């Protein structure tokens, strides 16, 4: 499976200016290509796909400002956004009730402040530096040490063993954020082998004071509780300082302090969720648990009613991010993950082997 190694580049970093320039050029190409696609779609009711746009823009200045492979990736991202819009729009016409609103056309990036992601494929990374464990995207002065294995291996090509370098690195992405950039090294990771038993189950109940409660179907194994109060504390501090700053700025304004506050909160929460998910997976490995059941409800944040204060704490905690971390870390070690609805778990007894029903949506009749 594919994993991501992340490097945070702040404004005082030596690579910041060059990355900012590249993301600005990417924005220019994205906006120009998006303009052409939108005009055709709105006025001619036709869709210009990637191949059509790429052929049109090959000689254009914004396209030539970056390496060809990088410009192609920008157009591919735009093409995926339009395909997603078309599919969503079709689904909306068939069943509007499944959506919270009508899908919008892919929009433009801000002319001055806007930045767009820059993607370098494995072919656009300099091989000489790559062999030494250094990522150097083509035609840049960015030299980044990576922990990913960059040793050369032989690859199977159409059944024949060819002497070609088989790198685990697939892409390098320059991702713009609020006031910093993230260099993402996307690589292929092999599944680790452990002696696990698929009939040994563990289930996770996600909550507020207890972020996760891990229970087992094997007698004698104590449940594992992951404390959720540190996340509540992070959110409470964030909400308090944010309200103070916004009272000075006005509701629709932002500031450098506010952006730093948002980044600090995000980094702290991600760090805590990574550590919590790693502890859970390590516990499953030690107990030889082969199957993990995760309770999850669709739209649980939109429909929850725990009171004003609890609602604020619950909604601000990114539970889906925790579930994603658990899922990919479980897959990495060969643990099977099963998702189940939680609507009726409180009415069913595990000790009595009660089934957990799943009901279709319908109108309540009094």
Which residues does each predicted region cover?
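Nucleic-acid substrate recognition interfaces
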Residues: 1-366
């Amino acid at each position: 499976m594919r994993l991501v190694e992340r490097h945070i580049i702040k404004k005082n970093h030596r690579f910041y200016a060059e990355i900012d320039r590249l993301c600005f050029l990417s924005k220019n190409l994205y906006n120009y290509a998006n303009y052409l696609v939108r005009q055709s779609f709105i006025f001619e009711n036709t869709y210009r796909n990637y191949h059509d746009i790429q052929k049109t823009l090959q000689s254009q200045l914004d396209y030539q400002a970056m390496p060809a492979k990088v410009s192609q990736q920008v157009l591919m991202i735009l093409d995926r956004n339009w395909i997603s819009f078309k599919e969503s729009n079709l689904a909306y016409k068939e069943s509007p009730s499944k959506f919270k609103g009508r899908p919008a056309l892919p929009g433009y990036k801000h002319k001055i402040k806007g930045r767009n992601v820059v993607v370098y494929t494995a072919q656009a990374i300099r091989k000489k530096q790559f062999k030494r464990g250094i990522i150097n995207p083509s035609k840049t002065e960015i030299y980044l040490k990576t922990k990913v294995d960059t040793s050369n291996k032989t690859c199977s090509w159409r059944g024949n063993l060819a002497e070609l370098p088989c790198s685990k690195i697939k892409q390098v992405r320059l991702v713009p954020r609020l006031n910093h950039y993230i260099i993402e090294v996307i690589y292929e990771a092999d599944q680790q082998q452990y002696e696990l038993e698929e009939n040994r189950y563990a289930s996770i109940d996600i909550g507020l004071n207890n972020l996760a409660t891990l229970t087992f179907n094997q007698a004698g194994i104590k449940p594992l509780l992951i404390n959720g109060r540190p996340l509540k504390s992070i959110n409470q501090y964030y909400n308090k300082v944010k309200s103070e700053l916004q009272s000075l700025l006005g509701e629709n304004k932002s500031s450098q302090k506010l952006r730093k506050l948002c980044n600090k909160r995000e980094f702290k929460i991600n760090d805590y969720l990574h550590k919590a998910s790693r502890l859970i997976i390590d516990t499953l490995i030690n107990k030889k648990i082969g199957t993990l059941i995760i309770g999850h409800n669709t739209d649980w944040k939109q429909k929850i009613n725990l009171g004003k204060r609890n609602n604020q704490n619950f909604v601000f905690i990114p539970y889906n991010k925790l579930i994603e971390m658990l899922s990919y870390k479980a897959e990495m070690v060969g643990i099977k993950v099963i998702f189940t609805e939680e609507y009726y778990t409180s009415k069913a007894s595990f000790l009595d082997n009660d089934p957990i029903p799943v009901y279709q949506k319908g109108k309540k009749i009094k």
